[in-house]
Each structure stands twice: as C-alpha cells, then as structure tokens.
Regions:
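Conserved alpha/beta catalytic core and glycan-binding cleft of carbohydrate-active enzymes
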Residues: 1-131, 135-136, 146, 210-216, ...
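Carbohydrate-interacting/catalytic domains
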Residues: 107-110, 119-135, 139-243
Length: 243
C-alpha cells in the first residue's frame, strides 16, 4: 500500500498513471507482440476498453470481473488516468498491428490505427500519443528501440505526404476534443451522470454523452467503435444527429 504504483493511484492526489488496461485491450498484451486485442478482432476485450473510456473510475455499467488487469477502479477522477495505445517502450502502433494481424493491408492498417486513436481521444482521462503516429510512424518492428540507431528511431517526414489523411484525422480528433468538454469531464460523478454505454454486438463498443455534459454545446454525443470488418447496427436514442 506504500508503493506509488497504478493500483494505489487513488491515494496519490494530483498524480496519474498510464492505463495498460486500455492499451492492451486495444492492441494486445505486452507479453506477446503477435497476439492482438480489440483492433484484431479478439473476443472479450470490450469491457477493458470501456473501463479505459470512463477513465478507470467505478461505473455501474462496467463489470470489473471482465477487465483484463484491474479488478477495481484505480482512480478517483478520470484526470488520474492516461489513455494511450502505444508509447516509446514496446512496439509502436503500426508495428504492433502488423505483428498481430498477419497479412494486414495498408488500408486495414490505416483504418485500425484511426480507430485506436478515436478510442483514445474520445475517452475520459488524459490522452497520450506517441510522436510520429500522426503520420503512421513505424520503427521497423523493433520491440524496444532505446539502443537502436537513428535509422530506426527517426521520423520520416515524407510520411506526411504519403498519409495526409492520417494526419488530418488526428488533427480533427484533437480539435474535436478541445472543442467539446463532454470528452474531458472533471470528476467521476460527472462521468457516471452523463456517460452511458449502449447495447452493442461483440467487437463493438458504443457510448453516449448526454444532457450537454460538462456544459457542452452539443446536447447528446454518440461514439461507436466498430472493430469488425462488416458494418453494424446500433440503436441510439431518438433524435436528430449530425454524422
């Protein structure tokens, strides 16, 4: 109980932790680069992803017995959780997708990359993005590049020209989050009050932010994360929506 570790974050006012529950739910476990997660269509990842979406707080719609690593909430506030899918340690996102999904096409890689960061940037908590992922960075499959040369760690700025759609999508996600306080609610009570999950099939996580959450100009917001290769149908509350 005296260690400053993730499990004890609730005792550390003003200090947060990276959410490996969410990271590994999205891309697969740290222990096996070739095993995928939600993005690869692996089953039973939804509850762990939902836990990350609420900022690792307690929430009545989350079954903690089905969360991958944590069996109880480990934050008092969503601001104590860092939401992310990759960082300087381990494989970067594009390398992990290639490693865990054999034969993945470039189109699939881009779509799943964007899906992952949509989850990160629409979740409660503090989003974190590895430098260069906004232009589909890779590190040639090197698992931990701290001792690798510049040929592995450098940023290939030509990727901005190769993948402008990726850069523009990331920019749009950041602008969306900055413009809408519903995605960055200040405390756990507000998250429990305004964020609810919708019924969804396997491979899909859907949630709504209701009643001008956080003073948002949008009354209701619906986010649907579909990792399946086929379209899906989700019943949403009656109303007029802009897609």
């Amino acid at each position: 109980d005296k260690l400053a570790m993730k499990a004890n974050t609730r005792q550390l006012n003003g200090i947060g932790a990276f959410c490996d529950d969410m990271r590994d739910a999205l891309r697969g476990p740290f222990s096996d680069d070739h095993k995928g997660g939600f993005l690869a269509g692996m089953p039973d990842m939804e509850e762990s992803l939902k836990f990350g979406i609420v900022g690792a707080i307690s929430h009545p719609q989350i079954d903690m017995t089905r969360v991958n690593y944590s069996k109880e909430a480990w934050t008092n506030s969503p601001t104590q959780m860092v939401s992310y899918v990759s960082c300087h340690d381990d494989l970067c996102l594009t390398d992990r997708l290639r490693s865990s999904i054999p034969g993945i096409t470039e189109d699939e890689l881009i779509r799943l990359d964007l899906l992952a960061q949509t989850a990160v940037l629409t979740s409660q908590g503090v989003p974190f993005i590895l430098c260069g992922e906004e232009m589909l960075r890779d590190k040639k499959g090197v698992h931990n590049s701290f001792k690798s040369p510049d040929s592995i760690n450098h940023l290939d700025w030509n990727n901005l020209k190769r993948y402008p759609q990726v850069f523009n999508y990331y920019s749009g996600l950041i602008a969306l989050r900055k413009s809408h306080p519903a995605f960055r609610l200040a405390n756990a009570d507000l998250v429990r009050k305004h964020l609810s999950f919708l019924d969804a099939p396997k491979g899909v996580v859907a949630f709504s932010l209701n009643d001008n959450a956080g003073g948002d100009s949008w009354r209701d917001i619906i986010v649907i994360l579909n990792a399946n290769k086929q379209p899906t149908d989700i019943n949403v509350p009656e109303g007029e929506y802009t897609v």
